[in-house]
Structure formats: C-alpha cells, structure tokens
Amino acid sequence: MKKLVIFDLDGTLLNSIADLGAAANYALTQCGFPTHPVSAYPKFVGSGITKLLERVLPESARNPERIEMMREYFKEYYGKHMSDYTEPYPGIPELLEQLTSRGIAVAVASNKYQDAVEHLVNHFFPGIPWAAVEGQKEGVP
C-alpha cells in the first residue's frame, strides 16, 4: 500500500501572511492606492495572486489591466522578500520529518506560482525528500 500526504503551502505548512501582505501593499502603493494592515490580509488570501489583488483593490478600481499591472509589482517584490517574515507553523518541520522517517511520502500542491513554491520549500524544509512540489504554472489550469 502506497502512502502519501499532500499539503497546501500557505496557511498549512507556512505562515506567509505578512510577506503576502507586504507584497500586495507594495503593489497597491506602486499603483497609487491605499494599503491595508497585515491583520486584514487573512480575509483577502486563499485563491491565488489574482484574486488577492482583486480583493485588496477598491471595487471601483478593479479591472483586468490594473490587476495585471499589480501582479507584476507583486511578483517583483515578493520574489525578493518572500521569506522576510514567513515561517513554518510550530511543529511542521518535525511532522514532516516523522512522516518521511516512517516511509510516508510528502508533497506540496499550491496555487502560489511554481518558482516561489520551490524556493520556499527548499528554504524552510531543506532536508525533506519531497515526492512532488507543484505550484501554479503559466498555461496550466
């Protein structure tokens, strides 16, 4: 019998809300909009970058072109700062080590873009033999 546990990344393995909020606030600032306190971000996240950016914008300012421009600012900032405040939830590194030591494969499936998923997994869980690390890829639904 094969054994595998698949984890989401943000909000499951990693508490990344402060870095996501900082990147979204950077994008808002670059586009001339007011920012939000980090404490507001849990209600904005959960469905990928595009939805996050849509949710942080004032309703009257939401349009595909603006969201795409903000997405570029978000990725620029987040690419350099994705691990400034992010950290594993308590007990997660030990849990992953226990699972793999018992022969249970572990994987990550995230709606975060692929490069960021790989970076964060390798940065925070360097000794874990991941069966798969999958994030959002251009052209793949």
Where are these regions (language model features)?
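Metal-dependent phosphoesterase signature
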Residues: R55-E94, I104
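Alpha-helical substrate-recognition element adjacent to the catalytic core
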Residues: Q30-S60, P90
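Short helix-capping segments at alpha-helix termini
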Residues: Q30-P34, E59-E65, R102, F125-P129
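Substrate-recognition element of Asp-dependent hydrolases with the DxDx(T/V) motif
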Residues: I92-N122, Q136
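An amphipathic alpha-helix signature
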Residues: G21, N25, P42, G46-E54, ...
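Substrate-recognition "cap/lid" segment bordering the active-site pocket of phosphatases
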Residues: D84-E87, Y113-P141
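Active-site neighborhood of HAD-like aspartate-dependent phosphohydrolases
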Residues: M1-K43
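Hydrophobic "anchor" residues on beta-strands that sit immediately upstream
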Residues: L4, A107, A132
